[in-house]
Amino acid sequence: MTTLKQDAICSIVVNIIRCLQCIHSLGFVHCDIKPGNILLDKEGNAVLGDLGLARQYTTSRRLVDKNNKRYGTLTYLSGDVHARVLPTRRSDMESLGWTIVELFGGKLPWRGLKYINTIETLKKEVDVTIFDDRVASYLLLVRATGYNDEPKYNEMLKIFAKDKPS
């Protein structure tokens, strides 16, 4: 596996945050953010692939998923999806956070576990400050986002801006 430089990772993250901002502005959530769905073009620009689970989101209230379905890949699921409520913009941003942990070479404490309840508990209880400072800042920002709130995209982008010192 090729290791990416920090600048390249930050550039990828910025591109994906912008992709999600665009998807969200159209009233949709991706629902399956993970490293395997991040594609790079010849110039190294990142885009999101596999929109097969994408769905419209609601901002009216916290809605229980009547289908009792979990949308996405277990390792990267958001707390909302674990709780069986419909995914929102926050859900995508949290899933991106778990993806960013791995892009920066971190290990998710639940990686390889198969018990959904154990994974859900670990995600709720994980001390995000164990990760890279940028990743921790990002995850804290996501955790501060309300279920129906618009993510603070500009603040998230600033965390990974090129002129930010490592």
Kindly label every feature range from the protein language model:
Residues 41-71:
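Activation segment/activation loop of eukaryotic-type protein kinase catalytic domains
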Residues 16-23:
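Conserved hydrophobic alpha-helix
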Residues 12-13:
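Activation segment signature within eukaryotic-like protein kinase domains
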Residues 24-41:
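Catalytic-loop of the protein kinase fold
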Residues 144-166:
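Terminal C-lobe "cap" of eukaryotic-type protein kinase domains
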